[in-house]
Amino acid sequence: MKFFTALAAVGALLAPAVALPTPASEASHNQTLSVRLVRAGHTMVRAIVTNNGERPLHLLSFNTIMDENPTSKVDVSHEDGGEVEFLGMLPRYDLSDLTEDLFTRLAPKDSVEHLFDIATVHDLKWDGKYTLTARGAIPVAEDGGTDIIDHVYYESNALEMDIDARKAAMVPRAFDDYFSKGLDKRRPLDICNPMKEKALRAALQDAQKVATEAAAAAQNNTEKVFEFFRARDPGTRKEVSKRLASISGVATMDGGSVTWFCSDGPRRCSPRIIAYTFPARNEVHPCSLFWQLPHRTNECHRQDRIGTVIHEGAHNPNAVTPHCKDHGYGYNRATALSHQRAMGNADNYALFANARQLVFCLLHLFLALPFIYIFANF
């Protein structure tokens, strides 16, 4: 009897590890944090972020409207329905061992403002009316802490801006100096030293294998597809499989449709960026953290070089169209996304492809069984 009591204890431990978060309507969570977009110039925007709650918020800015890097902060559409191309970067951040300086503390009823110019990272090539919206989730830690415990959702007002394309073109874009060099000059082979080239080729080759295996699994593993993409229908399984197969196809340094660099030519790496992608150019640049990651992790849902290749591959239009964005990082956030957002989130494909790592999570807990059994006999 005590054995089954102990087994039940293990089951209780396992339940949180394998239970799926319930996807929440992001709009319905828009009461704690509000974001108001205000025009501050011809193409300048001021985002006013307000804590409407009764408790302080400890907010992590990575890949949100508060990000200081030239990232996608707002969705931009033109009145004629034409696609507004994003010209900025999509970074993958290291979320381990976060430090206090990476957070913004927002007291109850307080606001913080962020000013940015949409012309620096968007191709505003048409005259006329543009509509801007911001929607997402910001990771939150306990006040004074650095462990992510939740996310607060935000959905802004729709800001309409009449823009003169010629004036917008005069705004220096974030990466004009770099892109003006041309691909040949941007990729000096001597920068890719033998050690880095070997590591990158190994990551690409194994990412090919992992993504190919995941593409096959997506066709048949209905529950695993539901776990990561919130749908079981054949159409979803087929699309997930197709995208993973395409990601596998671009994971090569030998004449593929995505260019994998060995260096940070644009000089946009920071201490927390693992790698970043320019979707407008189908280019991926690793940072120093990429080389420090393990080739293949044996920890639950941890970042490694193989997963980073799959994640970054999903950001490139030559692999996935439309390219995936960063709606959420990590297992808990990724599996809490709605179906539509999960299908467009790069980390969901990396996590799905590496889902076999869940075995390690279960193994660690099963190893605790003897200790639980002993405890149950006291």
Curated annotation (Swiss-Prot):
CDD domains found in the cross-reference section: M35_deuterolysin_like
GO biological process, one term: proteolysis
Residues annotated to bind Zn(2+): H311, H315, D326
Cystine pairs: C192-C262, C269-C287
E.C. code: 3.4.24.39
Compartment(s) where it occurs, according to its Swiss-Prot or TrEMBL record: Secreted
Protein purpose: Secreted metalloproteinase that allows assimilation of proteinaceous substrates. Shows high activities on basic nuclear substrates such as histone and protamine. May be involved in virulence.
Protein's name in the database: Neutral protease 2 homolog ARB_04336
